[in-house]
């Protein structure tokens, strides 16, 4: 149906019906000074003129080299990935309830689940969550449901958990009677001191949350914390960067018995930064907990003719069947982002992922080492890290970051917002996209900025 503007008689009839004297009266709650009576739009232009105009405007953009990290990472995305993802079969797909008409999409999700289960060392994976923070919240709720032996709904969290993740976790669980205790980190190494866990030994916890690499980039003492948690009857929820698992041991190998649930942000694998989203969260677990897992799960089966097929499985957990008794009110998944991640992992393979992770670590190590050679600059913590490290500066870090932007460099994440003791600290992150020349430019820009602002 074509759009036909309303005639004056139709507008009058509408106003008379609702008892309004004019169209303006419909918007009287909007202050007059906020209304735009006319828009300053020029006359129409042709396609060539439009292309030239947009090209000129695009040239005004300045692309800084990004070293921020802190939960969102700049990695190279092979061109083939989004060329494939943008195909109509993927781009416009809907939840594959009708399995016989959705085998392609279902298989992609199944392959994703298989890869994520392999990467994390777990038995099962769901089809994804909204993002890393909501994946953690759902993992905590899942752990509480699964831990039938726990006598409380208390959860123990290491302080170096990503602060945004913690806020989302608190928001989602606010009215569910769940309590959180925080284990303070060691100021010398930026991670949880396992000996401090004994201060909580007399409290019954349903779950313990461990992030490694943690928010400050440090590798947690995952073995010690995991063993302590299991000894005291708690399930272990691991939060991790999937890229790090290409070179670090999987959560399944943490401690004597491994983590129970693994979650995190999948953005590093083929998903662009895109001003904060859309991203996707991943969640995997041991088979013992799979019936408490939220979200879609795709299974592989054989039909009556012996042909391999895929379908949504264990659907009795989900909202469209169990309604209020479902494991979660999430009734979707980030299918498009999952498709990108699946293609990314397929293209790179195990060796490619390991190479990306190794180069990211090496570049971060090089950047940190070179920065520490500058007078007044030092590496804050003396423990192992993956691809992020905290740097202490002789000046206010927020001022430093602002000045570095003038050098076309996003120098890092200002940590003063995270902790008052870190007002002169930034967290820097390097990945495989940063060249040796990029790192040299960062070092020279740092010297220049420190000289300019009195460092």
Swiss-Prot record:
InterPro entries: GcvPA (IPR023010), GDC-P_N (IPR049315), GDC_P (IPR020581), PyrdxlP-dep_Trfase (IPR015424), PyrdxlP-dep_Trfase_major (IPR015421), PyrdxlP-dep_Trfase_small (IPR015422)
Domain of life: Bacteria
Alphabetical UniProt keywords: Oxidoreductase
One function term, GO molecular function aspect: glycine dehydrogenase (decarboxylating) activity
Enzyme Commission number(s) of this protein: 1.4.4.2
Reactions this protein catalyses: N(6)-[(R)-lipoyl]-L-lysyl-[glycine-cleavage complex H protein] + glycine + H(+) = N(6)-[(R)-S(8)-aminomethyldihydrolipoyl]-L-lysyl-[glycine-cleavage complex H protein] + CO2
A Gene Ontology BP annotation from the UniProt entry: nucleoside metabolic process
Role, per record: The glycine cleavage system catalyzes the degradation of glycine. The P protein binds the alpha-amino group of glycine through its pyridoxal phosphate cofactor; CO(2) is released and the remaining methylamine moiety is then transferred to the lipoamide cofactor of the H protein.
HAMAP family: GcvPA
Family: Belongs to the GcvP family. N-terminal subunit subfamily.
Self-association and partners: The glycine cleavage system is composed of four proteins: P, T, L and H. In this organism, the P 'protein' is a heterodimer of two subunits.
Protein name: Probable glycine dehydrogenase (decarboxylating) subunit 1
Native source species: Francisella tularensis subsp. mediasiatica (strain FSC147)
Gene name for this UniProt entry: gcvPA
